[in-house]
UniProtKB/Swiss-Prot annotation:
SUPFAM superfamilies: F-box domain (SSF81383), RNI-like (SSF52047). This is F-box/LRR-repeat protein 12. Pfam families: LRR_6. Residues 13-61 form the F-box domain. Gene3D superfamilies: Ribonuclease Inhibitor. The lineage of its organism: Eukaryota, Viridiplantae, Streptophyta, Embryophyta, Tracheophyta. It comes from Arabidopsis thaliana. PANTHER family: PARTNER OF PAIRED, ISOFORM B-RELATED (PTHR13318). It comes from the Eukaryota. LRR repeats lie at residues 75-100, 101-126, 127-152, 154-177, 178-203, 226-250, 252-278, 279-304, 305-330, 331-356. The keyword Repeat applies. Keywords: Leucine-rich repeat, Repeat.
Length: 395
């Protein structure tokens, strides 16, 4: 019989001998930035695995952290040269945030050619040097974007149309504080991107809303806080029939007492969250129509809606059977009789935000507490309600 020595049976093994796919699996499950960096410092092979495994990148100057492990340990001033070095190294990125990188300009985005079509999410918040030329570069290199944030960028209708035509799979778009974007750009976006789910256009003073007319039924989230919306624009926003979240707080004076009646016409029957805060001119006609026509409504912000009177509050109490949260802070015309209507109705109400209502007596409030112990009364005034625009598509 052949004598096999013990040394012949012992095969030297260690983590170094693992195949690349196993090492990549290990890297993806490291939690901390320090562990990621240490992994790449082991050897050239592991550094390459780190490079091709990284899917997300952002910088310390970013306003929100998508993933702590994606933070780059660098100084806040990200230059074009620095960005080029990083994107040539991490060419498999799917999520990139350049938010707060204020020194970048249009030519800086040429480096996007490296992640290119793999990139799905791009944040350019407060990149003041990015204009339509930079957006054209994005459109050329990144056709598969689904989430784009251009908050406070110098983009116009031309750039938005270019992006919309190139990135047909766009689902979530943030155009807040983009003063050069008007209804023409919104029309291009809503007609080209048929998978659009959420759009944020807060403080875009050139948008009236008519550009949304004929939008896709997938559009379920629109944040139009402090826009110059018109009645036809409101109708346009809900025209797709899929709207679930609508924020038109601080709506322009063009909306009269009956200006929001179309919301209750049945087109917005899926509406669950409605923010009408500071819609001071909206009256009972609109409130009654919405209360009847939006049976799924779960949260409604009517803070500072001074023209809502007794018949409006009675409609809310009678028809809003699924309402869980109601905001009535500083409503001048919420009186004891209106509060009684809310007390006798809204049987699923859980939280009532209420303070600064001068016409309410302490007795009426105490009676409300006594008869509706199931409702929590809160005095704080909520400026923002509902889900974040980025998270809506993930729900």
């Amino acid at each position: 019989m052949e004598d096999v020595s013990e040394s012949d049976n012992n095969v030297e093994t260690s983590i170094i001998h693992l195949p690349d796919d196993c090492l990549s699996f290990i890297f993806q499950r490291l939690d901390s930035v320090a562990d990621h960096d240490s992994f790449g410092l082991t050897c050239h092979r592991w550094l390459n695995i780190q490079n091709i495994s990284r899917r997300s990148l952002q910088f310390q100057c970013s306003f929100s952290v998508l993933n702590p492990s994606s933070l780059s340990q660098t100084n806040p001033d990200v230059s074009s040269h620095h960005l080029h070095r990083l994107l040539t190294r991490f060419q498999w990125l799917e999520h990139l945030s350049l938010s707060g990188c204020t020194v970048l300009n249009d030519s800086s985005l040429d480096s996007l050619r490296y992640p290119g079509a793999r990139l799905h999410t791009l944040y350019l918040d407060c990149c003041f040097g990015i204009s339509d030329d930079g957006i054209s570069t994005i459109a050329s290199f990144c056709p598969n974007l689904s989430v784009v944030s251009l908050y406070r960028c110098n983009i116009s209708d031309i750039g938005l149309e270019t992006l919309a035509r190139a990135s047909l799979s766009l689902k979530c778009v943030n155009l807040s504080y983009c003063p050069l974007v008007s209804d023409f750009g919104i029309k291009a976006l809503s007609q080209a991107c048929l998978q659009l789910e959420s759009v944020k256009i807060s403080n875009c003073k050139s948008i009236t809303g008519v550009g949304f007319s004929g939008c896709s039924p997938t559009l379920g989230y629109v944040d139009a806080d402090s826009c110059q919306l018109e009645p036809k624009g409101i109708t346009g926003i809900i025209s797709g029939g899929g709207i679930e979240f609508l924020n038109i707080s601080g709506v322009s004076c063009y909306i009269r007492k009956d200006g929001l009646v179309p919301i209750g016409s049945g087109i917005a029957s899926k509406l669950r969250i409605l923010n009408l805060r500071m819609c001071r001119t909206v009256g009972d006609e609109s409130i009654e129509a919405i209360a009847k026509g939006c049976p799924l409504l779960q949260e409604w912000n009517l803070a500072l809606c001074h023209e809502v009177k007794i018949s409006g509050w009675e409609a809310v109490g009678k028809w809003c059977r699924n309402l869980k949260k109601l905001h009535v802070n500083r409503c001048r015309n919420l009186c004891d009789q209106g509060l009684l209507a809310l007390r006798c109705g809204c049987m699923n109400l859980q939280i009532l935000y209420m303070n600064g209502n001068a016409r309410l007596t302490p007795t009426a409030i105490e009676m409300f507490r006594l008869h509706r112990a199931d409702i929590t009364l809160r005095t704080e005034e909520m400026m923002v309600i509902g889900p974040d625009w980025r998270l809506y598509a993930q729900e």
